[in-house]
């Protein structure tokens, strides 16, 4: 039995080494941020909901985070901001994958920008007076992918996350389009 476990571990190491050898392209965008986003966790309201609903919430709900200080960043030559008070849940990684890929880990910055873009269908310039204009779901998914590649350098991982978004992201996109959130009301 131990040979199987060691074999799987050795296979994963060799596979990681091979992927790393070919995972050396230049990112599509230049991303910069002077600091990490300042954020606080929000509680998951499970108290008083009953046993079964509490279990369901535990299995299906993701923790939400609130930005506590305007977070400034740049993509290529544009400078943008995620305003204080914005609430997001990070990269929507299915719970069964979170042991290996945390939504608040290497996908954090791209996930934050992506969540803002999904909610408002645009990115907010640092002046807080104008936006990039309406973006498509695919455009926001590409921003997520390209920012994360620029931040963490993992092409294969970020392309896998990108294709996951292309397959399942339409649910969140449609939910936000139905809510019709206005960025001006939230700054």
Predicted regions and their residues:
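Extended terminal accessory/targeting regions
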Residues: 2-187
């Amino acid at each position: 039995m131990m040979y199987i476990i060691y074999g799987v571990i050795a296979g994963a190491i060799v596979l990681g080494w091979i992927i790393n050898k070919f995972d050396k392209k230049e990112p599509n965008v230049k991303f910069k941020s002077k600091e990490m986003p300042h954020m606080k966790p929000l509680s998951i309201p499970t108290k008083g909901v009953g046993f079964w609903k509490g279990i369901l919430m535990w299995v299906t709900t993701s923790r939400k985070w609130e930005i506590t200080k305007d977070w400034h960043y740049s993509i290529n030559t544009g400078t943008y901001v995620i305003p204080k008070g914005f609430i997001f849940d990070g990269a929507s990684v299915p719970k069964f994958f979170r042991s290996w890929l945390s939504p608040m880990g290497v996908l954090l910055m791209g996930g934050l920008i992506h969540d803002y873009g999904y909610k408002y269908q645009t990115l907010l310039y640092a002046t807080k007076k104008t936006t990039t204009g309406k973006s498509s779901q695919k455009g926001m998914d590409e921003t997520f992918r390209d920012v994360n590649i620029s931040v963490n350098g993992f092409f294969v991982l970020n392309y896998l996350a990108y294709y996951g978004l292309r397959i399942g992201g339409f649910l969140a996109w449609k939910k936000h389009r139905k809510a019709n959130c206005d960025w001006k009301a939230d700054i």
